[in-house]
Amino acid sequence: MSELCSAGILGTGHYAPEKILSNADLEKMVDTSDEWIRTRTGIETRHIASRSETTSDLCVKAALPALEMAGLTPDDIDYIIVATASPDYVVPSTACMVQDKLGCKHAGAMDISAGCSGYIYAVALASNLVKAGMYKHILIIGAEILSRLVNWQDRSTCILFGDGAGAAVIGKVEDGYGLLASDLGSDGSLGKILNIPASGVAEPVTHRAIDSGRIYIHMEGPEVFKAAVRHMGATTLKTLKAAGITKEDINMFIAHQANNRIIQAIAKRLALPEDHMYVNVNRYGNTSAASVGIALDEVVRAGRVKHGDYVVLTGFGAGLTWGCDVMRWM
């Protein structure tokens, strides 16, 4: 059996819709305040997709700059993975919509549903498919239009979420670089603390479900907070060990941008200096599967990661799911 190659990120991209919804705007919609939102979440603004935009549209707009950075065309992509909790349709997959809109004539396509951990899962899956020699260039995208899945009369959730997409192209890299280790976990017994109750065959959408608000995101905030901090901290330490490095070696740490208090709690647990982590939840809100990809593209384009840096991505989301990817940057 031939030795596996190394695989990593060749290019990144992101897209955020033009419309921005501020905390001041939300003050006019629900019983809340800018101070209350900022002190509890760190969020100041979030982007909202137009009614004409679909999740696959956001995916395409994030994918194009990623392809350009990688020096590739749609014809070079032989597999597409879209991580989303807000697909265009239940069937067909959003990834198939992206394949068509981008013109990736030779690509297979699939969606993965891992909540806010979706981008972490996609990086791990795509990298290992390339390592195994099954594909040469895989386009991964985390994308969400959560503004259509929140109850805009529920101040506990509508203040949190935003829309956007983050993309990356995964391919072969120099030995010793790219994905060094990953860890993916789940606990379905806690799925009920973060879900959309009426959204499938177990509980179909009915008039009663609509009237009772069960078609919208439901979240038990305190329980989600505790689980997020616990699992993201643990999965990060586990993956660092598997990669053969320590937390002191981390050059850039990007956690799922759910809530600034969660991010700071994880950073404190790992004793990370502020200049080794990145936070943009203040500008985007929680974009679920898109958040890590958006943040990664911003740090790459700002020149905050360089050749040889150790980059750590970690996430937590509905499922419950969690995961971590440790990479050495090309």
Model-identified regions with their sequence ranges:
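Condensing-enzyme catalytic core mediating Claisen C-C bond formation in acyl metabolism
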Residues: 1-51, 154-226, 230, 234, ...
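Short beta-strand segments
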Residues: 10, 83, 113, 138-144, ...
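Acidic-glycine-rich active-site phosphate/pyrophosphate-binding loop
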Residues: 30-39, 89-103, 140-146, 201-209, ...
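Claisen-condensing/thiolase-fold acyl-transfer catalytic domains that form or cleave C-C bonds
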Residues: 56, 60-63, 67, 86-87, ...
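Short glycine-rich phosphate-binding loop at a beta-alpha junction
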Residues: 75-83, 248-256
